Design a protein with these regions (language model features):
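Juxtamembrane regions of bacterial inner-membrane/periplasmic proteins
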Residues: 2-291, 308-310, 363
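Short loop/turn microsegments at loop-to-beta-strand junctions
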Residues: 42-44, 296-299
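A short, polar/charged loop-to-alpha-helix boundary motif
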Residues: 66-71, 317-331
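Active-site SXXK
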Residues: 81-83, 278, 306-307, 328-360, ...
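Short, well-structured active-site flanking segments
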Residues: 91-100, 173-176, 323, 349-367, ...
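Conserved catalytic neighborhood of penicillin-recognizing serine enzymes
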Residues: 107-134, 247, 251, 255-258, ...
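Glycine-rich, acidic and aromatic/proline-enriched surface loops and short helix-turn segments
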Residues: 126-130, 164-171, 188, 192-204, ...
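Active-site-proximal helix/loop microenvironment
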Residues: 183, 214, 420-429
Length: 429
């Protein structure tokens, strides 16, 4: 080691030693793997009706309200306001702004007001890597990762990540989720006052969480308005909370969220007005017929020309555990019962086994140990095929099913792509 150091001094290579750390840093920036700022981030599922209004908003896998929002979907005025408030030199620095850091350090050492020296890029690093940056070592790592992030990704990609990760109080992250939760709007629909109010939150999301009765938040909004010479609107803000998020069309929304566990925005063909009419109609129908033992009902409304589902109510009351209201009756498996009888008669007609006036016996009969009865508990003896079908007699239908040639009822259903059929022997006939 002494010989090597002697050669370095003798040849003058010592002058190049300061360049080695810089070269190592450049090599690390260029060659070290750098994950995308939103890689591995989970998002909420948002179900919309056919007008674009939200029906349901779910939590992300890590229990956050976080809605993926593209930078192009955020108004330019809102972007410029955030840059002005958070990082004026975002588009000119390499990820770290030494002047801001120096100014923040001087203010802190001088006992003045604590100032933030972190750039938007540094904030994205802290949020995406879940860093605690209170210690010097962690702050240095944050700065290095910010430089690396700027090396590998564009400014717009980093800014988009910020708008998806910034904290807005509680478990609400990102401007898209904040706009929806607090104002029931998309970012593009926010007023100037609403955008300005949300812009204040990420710097102190605990104390500045938006609510109608948060004095810290109200004071921050007032100070911003004064600082901007009254350019923000003065109309009082109507602020909502997570408890006010919509919970509409619960059965179909639950099904869609189960299918799309990675989140994202899904637009359905549901009509909000028709959906409410169907739900109200089912509740009224079940109430009117409760005396007859009817406790529950389900309905599916399909627009025939387009085959689009316009309304779906899986039960009379989703929240009523007594009727298992959370179970979707439109999807629950159950016996088709008498709905198969017209198919049996149609096949028998096609195969020349009967005509409408063919007499069929409606009398007690056993089919491999099964003794069918009729809904009225009686048998009518000889009846025409037309009358047997019209009055839904069971023995004539089973007799015809046994007489069918090719295709039989089972083969007919299989050709029609009826799902979940068991083997033919399972059904006996």
């Amino acid at each position: 080691m002494k010989i090597l150091w002697s050669k370095i001094r003798r040849t003058g290579l010592w002058a190049a030693l300061p360049a080695i750390p810089l070269a190592a840093l450049l090599a690390w920036l260029f060659f070290a793997p750098c994950r995308a700022p939103l890689e591995g981030v989970s998002f909420s599922g948002v179900i919309l009706d056919n007008t674009g209004a939200p029906l349901r908003v779910s939590l992300s896998r890590d229990q956050k309200y976080r809605i993926h929002t593209r930078l192009t979907d955020i108004p330019r005025a809102a972007v410029e306001a955030v840059l002005r408030y958070e990082d004026r030199h975002f588009y000119s620095h390499p990820g770290v702004n030494p002047f801001s850091l120096f100014r923040a350090a001087l203010s802190m050492l001088g006992g003045g007001r604590r100032m933030g020296g972190s750039t938007i890029t540094m904030q994205v690093v802290r949020l995406s890597h879940n860093l605690e940056t209170g210690k010097p070592g962690a702050k240095l790592r944050q700065m290095l990762l910010a430089l690396q992030l700027e090396w590998h990704f564009s400014k717009d990609e980093i800014l988009e990540a910020y708008f998806n990760l910034a904290p807005y109080g509680g478990n609400i992250e990102g401007l898209g989720a904040a706009a929806l939760v607090y104002f029931h709007k998309t970012p593009a629909q926010l007023t100037q006052a609403e955008s300005a109010a949300l812009m204040l939150v990420p710097q102190n999301p605990v104390k500045r969480r938006p609510s109608q009765d948060n004095p810290v938040f109200a004071a921050a909004v007032k100070r911003l308005d004064q600082a901007w010479s009254g350019r923000t609107e003065h109309a009082p803000l109507r602020i909502y909370g997570p408890q006010d998020l919509p919970f509409e069309a619960p059965h179909i929304c639950a099904e869609l969220l189960e299918r799309h566990r990675d989140g994202g925005v899904l637009r359905t063909t549901l009509s909000p007005t028709l959906q409410k009419r169907v739900e109200g109609g089912l509740r009224a129908f079940a109430s009117r017929n409760a005396a007859y033992g009817l406790k529950n009902a389900a309905a599916l409304v399909v627009h025939w020309p387009s085959m689009e589902i316009r309304a779906l109510a899986g039960s009379a009351d989703f929240h009523d555990a007594r009727i298992s209201g959370e179970i979707d009756g439109t999807r629950a498996r159950r016996s088709p019962g008498s709905t198969l009888k017209p198919l049996i008669y149609a096949l028998a007609l096609d195969q020349g086994i009967i005509h409408p006036h063919t007499l069929l016996l409606d009398t007690p009969r056993s089919f491999a140990g099964y003794d069918p009865e009729n809904f009225d508990g009686s048998f009518r003896g000889p009846v025409s095929a037309a009358e047997a079908l019209r009055s839904s007699r069971n023995v004539p239908a089973l007799t015809l099913a046994a007489r069918l040639k090719h295709p039989g009822l089972y083969e007919f259903l299989r050709r029609a792509d009826v799902e979940f059929l068991s083997g033919e022997e399972h059904y006996g006939l």
